[in-house]
Amino acid sequence: MRSGAERRGSSAAASPGSPPPGRARPAGSDAPSALPPPAAGQPRARDSGDVRSQPRPLFQWSKWKKRMGSSMSAATARRPVFDDKEDVNFDHFQILRAIGKGSFGKVCIVQKRDTEKMYAMKYMNKQQCIERDEVRNVFRELEILQEIEHVFLVNLWYSFQDEEDMFMVVDLLLGGDLRYHLQQNVQFSEDTVRLYICEMALALDYLRGQHIIHRDVKPDNILLDERGHAHLTDFNIATIIKDGERATALAGTKPYMAPEIFHSFVNGGTGYSFEVDWWSVGVMAYELLRGWRPYDIHSSNAVESLVQLFSTVSVQYVPTWSKEMVALLRKLLTVNPEHRLSSLQDVQAAPALAGVLWDHLSEKRVEPGFVPNKGRLHCDPTFELEEMILESRPLHKKKKRLAKNKSRDNSRDSSQSENDYLQDCLDAIQQDFVIFNREKLKRSQDLPREPLPAPESRDAAEPVEDEAERSALPMCGPICPSAGSG
């Protein structure tokens, strides 16, 4: 096992964890920003990939849980009981705190009032989604999440809506995303990165079986649980392809997008398939080990220039990395998708992963090298400040605001609507949004099935609902046109 100093550096000219001269690590979601050196005596996270710089505790999570637990236990006797036939809605949850902000939604921690289970709740403002042409993406993500469940995914439990927002309630993972830990200058060991590669390999293998290309695998979209296991999230630009089909749309985050996506967009051709997600895993793994990505690509780069870049620039590997890890990264970062490592079988055959107990891994019986500090909530505390101070429609004031809006709408002549188009879109979303309850679905699957009665004879043929039409996800159609992303 190498020291933390060895794991970042590649030469004496650059300090460990620093980009080469003239290549500063960019800020923002595409890449982590450098932080000042740690103060003396600052705590270090337990890891074979340790931490150089840890911030002061943002949130005493264990104390908060203890305090909330005592107050909630007193209320357990009067815990609400919701009608099982009633659709889940906003009133079924207690909002605890804001923890994040996505591409077009926000995330908070919630507790379901009847079961006291904790979840993360993502909510997206309908009007903003319409204005940003994101309605189709939200509906596609819902369609996908309602059909999948895996140990290394962030799984959907409930979806519902109100007049303002669409809600997705998912697994709560308290370990933070890998982008956050990169920004905290966590030095990930090879063993830790190997585990992430394996866990993502199992997730991608499952998604392939469901005909799903994620298209946005990156540190921002990989969340850790309290024990340090990795889970893939954010399916808002994922796509479903049938056997033999290829995707063609330019979709993803540029620094993590595979060369064939750019090539397909610029030169046409046959498109791309599941191999693109494995390239992204390679970029992510390289970044976790070195602190910056293998290619100097940013969102501002022209697509045409990126096609040229992959044929002219070679990836540089750190001499201190093991030859097995370098070989694994080379296979993941192979420009030609036909020669790229891009299946679970390929990964399992890699020498770098020869000792992995895959059965134990799929049951989370392999202990991660990096375990997030349980005394902190691993997110930016400004999210909660923004929600409380800057947000014009804060979630904690929703009930009062909706009641006020309802009263105002009832007193106004509907024929004087300022924006008929917007209202038509909102009405279409209200009608087409799919409500989902995985908890109820699991209960119904566990019930013993009674034998079906013999069908009665019918004098006249009854119309039969078309199966494809029944299973198709309704969209806003011509009212709220959104670009597809095949």
Swiss-Prot record:
Keyword Nucleotide-binding attached:
yes
Q: Where does ATP bind?
A: I99, G100, K101, G102, S103, F104, G105, K106, V107, K122
- Region ranges (Disordered): 1-56, 396-419, 444-486
Compositionally biased region (Basic residues): 396-405
Q: Which GO terms describe its biological process?
A: intracellular signal transduction
Q: Which UniProt keywords apply?
A: ATP-binding, Kinase, Magnesium, Metal-binding, Nucleotide-binding, Phosphoprotein, Serine/threonine-protein kinase, Transferase
What SUPFAM superfamilies does this protein's entry cite? Protein kinase-like (PK-like) (SSF56112)
Please list the residues that make up the active site: D216
Q: According to the UniProt record, which cysteines are disulfide-bonded?
A: none
Q: Sites of the modification Phosphoserine?
A: S10, S15, S18
As recorded in UniProt, its EC number(s) are 2.7.11.1
Which Pfam families does the UniProt record give?
Pkinase
User: Which residues lie in Low complexity bias regions?
Assistant: 24-33
Name its co-factor(s).
Answer: Mg(2+)
User: Which reactions fall under this protein's catalytic activity?
Assistant: L-seryl-[protein] + ATP = O-phospho-L-seryl-[protein] + ADP + H(+); L-threonyl-[protein] + ATP = O-phospho-L-threonyl-[protein] + ADP + H(+)
Single annotated GO MF:
protein serine kinase activity
Lineage top rank: taxon: Eukaryota
Q: Which residues form the Protein kinase domain?
A: 93-353
- Family membership: Belongs to the protein kinase superfamily. Ser/Thr protein kinase family.
What is the name of the protein in this document? Serine/threonine-protein kinase 32C
Species whose genome carries this gene: Homo sapiens
